[in-house]
Every structure is written in structure tokens, then in C-alpha cells.
Amino acid sequence: MVSSFTAPSFYPSSHVPSLQAEYIGKSLCDINPPAAILDAAVLRRNCKRMLTATQTLGVGFRAHVKTHKTTQLAELQVGKDTKSVNLIASTVAEIENLAPWLLECQSQGKTTSILYGVPLAPSTIPRLASLARILGPGVLGIFVDHADHVKVLSEVDESTWPGRIPIWVNIDVGYHREGVPSDSKQLADIAYALSASKRVTLGGIYAHMGHSYGVSSPGEALSFFGHELEGLEQGAISFLKCTDAHATNDPNAEKIVLSLGATPTARAIQNLLSGEATESVEAYRATLDRINQSFAVEIHAGVYPVLDLQQTATRAAPSGPGANETSYDDIAFRVLVEVNGVYPERSEKSEALIAGGCILLGREACKSYPGYGIVTPWPAQEGRFYDPAGSKTGWIVGKVAQEHGNLWWEGPAENVRPLEIGQKLMLWPNHACIAGAHFGWYLVVDSEEEDPEVVRDVWVRWRGW
């Protein structure tokens, strides 16, 4: 079945056939910078690891789409053979653009669920209600962390929003972005409002441990995961007590979903399957199994398919069997730039200029090194590149203005990798979510193909809110 629904055109996307005609078949060295590059082989590998880990542990998985904002990568995140498509989005526009594919999934007999992952703003209700009518009852879930959210939704009639509206109660487990503490009166008030409403139903309990980005080892990431899981369990128990409901060990009863994760803690679960049966690993695995008997534990994450320098700095998970930690080979996203100027005698460090500043890369720091991006060894895959955990010798983006980026050589001057005006370079960005947002589309290559430099496809990113 082909859906007739199209997303509102206030932020129109670029014409895909024109982009494909322009780019497919070209080599990366012939592309005009700046450009956003994805490696499909790395994406497949990262997505497979996450799905394998959650399936092996017997927990659910919900893919966040905010990083990439593409249908193609959302499909990789959930897996081609899945029977359940569970997603979370940060903007209404993301859901609008996913709607045609979700309808296609429904026509194939797959169950679908998508959450609007920001506590409800009343102004979004008309667009969300329109989506709920298109997708069907119970598909679109709404975040709440205040009783007024429940009251606002309770005033929406069924002709506007069919069926009971699933709400996901957001528990604050220490990140202090959104959510309410598990022992708060505000959480109890949400529970009472839910009990009094005939229009909403409990979809699940949710937590996001964004401060897990500060971890520096697999063990530390697992510790954050355990804290997040137990905090979410406590919030769920407190909430259910106020609604006169309770968790159940009955295998035939429908369990309440507990959804937790950020990419570091979500990737940390791979360490539960690493084969190293340490006391701490066994304890975290036992906690997960215990809670999963009473609730339906679900992991959510978003940036893990593409990864970036912030994520490699967490060292939250190994890159594969026998590996100790994530490597640069696990980063699927790179930014193509061109050298605009060279300044070998400007200061103690050789410098160069690229036409790519904070508008291109963002201004978010990375704890493992003092810059905003690292120059990769592309295209020859030889020569020195800066490794925060190794030699710390190579080119980094050391300073950014709006459209200017200054490359700094770090390490001994005699080892400098010479740069020339007009030379094209690839950068690993600090934060893929921010750097990707500055582009209208990705150029997709595949390192498992005979020529890994050839553009195989163009994936257009959704725009707007």
C-alpha cells in the first residue's frame, strides 16, 4: 500500500532525483565541499550490534531518529525483519516525515509505535492529532511530566484524536533536563490526573540519562546503566502505587514498559554479553533480568548508528569481539571540507584554514581533546592523525568562528602532515547530531563495496520542527 500522506511543505526537502543524478557514481574526491558523508557499511554494523544485544538480553528496543532525520537509517535501526517498529522523535516534523513509511509498515502487518519525545506543548496538539488520525489509535505516544499535560490531553475529544492517548511519564534519574523525581509530589499528581481521565492511558515510563556522555570506560557506563534502570524502576513503582496498579510477574499479563537509555548506557549493555563474567557484570545482568520479569524493559538510543568523537570518548562499549573500546572505524559520519589557507609560520603550531566553522561543525567540546573536529587520514588512509588516547599528533579543528575553522597541528613540528590550498580533507565531528543538522542531505558510500569512495546514494534529511 502506498500512502497518500505527505508532510507539510513549510520546510520543503530537496528534490531527491536531482540530487541522485548529481552525485551517484561520483568519487568523494570529486565532490565540492562541504558535504556530509555516511558509510553504509559502518551504519549496518552499528545497528546490527544494538539489535543483537537487545534481542539476546530479551529486552525491547526503540530507535531515536533525531540524529539523522532520514527514513533510510530509521529502517536500518529497527531491522528489515522486525515485526515491531518502535521509534522516538524530537520534533513533530520527524513524525510527519515518518508517517508514510509507518503506514507502509502497518500494511505489512507490523505493529508501530512512535513517541513525541518532548513534554507536550499545547500548540503542537493540532498537528499531533492529525498524525494520530492518520496512524491510528494507540500509535502516537506523548511525553508528560506534569499533571497539566494530562489535563490538556483530556480535553481533546475523540473525533479529534481517536482512541485513548498513550502517555509516557518521564522520570528524572539525575540528568535534570525533563522529567520528575520518583519521590516527588509532581509524579503523584500525574498519576492522580491519569486515574481521573477518560481520554489518556499509560503507555510507559521513560528516562534519559544524558549525563552518561561523561563516562570514560565500559564499567562506568554500566554503572550509569544500572543507576538509570533502578531509578526508573523506583519511579514506576511510586507512580503505580498512586494509580492503585502494580507490576506483575504473570507471564500472560501485559507489562508496563520501562524505557531507558542514552547512547552510552544503551551501548553499555553490549558489555553484558562480552563473555567477561565479572562480579559487576553478573550483578547488572541479574538486576536487568529481575526488573524485566515485572516490567517490559526497553532500551532507546539515537546517535549510536553514526557515532562521533564524543561517543568514542565515553569508551562505553567495545567495537567488536576481542576489542577493548570503540574505535574511529566505528564512526560512520564524516564531513568533507577544503583547505582555504595555510599558515606554517603563524605561531608555534602550523595552522590552516577551512571554510567550515561552528555553522558547519557546531561549537560543542569533546572531553578527550581540545578541539571541534579531527582531520581523518583520508584519502590515502596513511599519515598521522590525532588520537586522543594515543600519540596526540595530527591536525585538529582548534578554533571556530561562524564560517571559518582554524586547523592546528598538534605534536612535534617535524612530523607535520603538509597541507595545501585546495586540498580536500575529511573531519570526524565532535557531535554528529549537531554537525548533521547543518546539511540538507547525506552522501552515502559503502566501505564494503569494491570502491569505497564512490557515492552510492543520497539520503535527504528532514527539516523543521
Model-flagged regions — what are they?
Residues R62-P218:
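Active-site-proximal beta-alpha core segment in soluble small-molecule metabolic enzymes
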Residues M1-D30, E104-Q106, T160-P162, C242-N249, ...:
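Eukaryotic N-terminal low-complexity, Ser/Thr- and Lys/Arg-rich leader segments
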Residues I24-A36, A40-A41, N46-L57:
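N-terminal, Lys/Arg-enriched amphipathic/low-complexity engagement segments
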Residues L43, K66, L98, V169, ...:
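Conserved, mostly hydrophobic/aromatic
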Residues P344-W465:
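C-terminal accessory subdomain/extension
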Residues M50, T56, V78, Q108-T111, ...:
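Alpha-helix-loop-beta-strand connector modules within alpha/beta enzyme cores
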